[in-house]
Regions:
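Generic structural motif
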Residues: 20, 31, 79-81
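Flexible, active-site-adjacent loop/turn segments at secondary-structure boundaries
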Residues: 29, 33, 64
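Structural detector for hydrophobic anchor residues on beta-strands
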Residues: 11, 24, 34-36
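Short aromatic-glycine-(Arg/Gly/Cys) micro-motifs in beta-strand/loop hairpins
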Residues: 16-29
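A short, exposed loop/beta-hairpin motif centered on an aromatic-Gly-Thr core
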Residues: 32-43
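Short, charged, surface-exposed hinge/linker loops at domain edges
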Residues: 1-14, 46-82
Length: 82
């Protein structure tokens, strides 16, 4: 489910070329704080995906909400005490 979430989020990524240095800037608008800036579009996509994965893991670890993307939700359930 996490892989599918990442794939769908990456489909929503927005990219632009920054006029100051002609580098590529990418972000996923639904995921606040997930952005990357690299010299090439390929590197920007790769870094953006890595940042998204780290962002997801941090939100899961801290039990923070994760926005729904294309009908996919990730919910954290409390572990029961053994």
């Amino acid at each position: 489910m996490i892989r599918e979430y990442i794939d769908r989020a990456m489909d929503q990524a927005k990219y632009e070329i920054l006029p100051e240095d002609q580098s590529y800037y990418g972000e996923i608008p639904a995921c606040q704080g997930v952005f990357a800036n690299c010299a090439t579009l390929e590197k920007c996509r790769k870094e953006l995906e890595e940042i998204l994965e780290e962002w997801l893991l941090l939100r899961i670890y801290k039990n923070l909400s994760i926005p729904e993307i294309d009908g996919i939700t990730i919910t954290i359930k409390e572990a029961s005490a053994a």
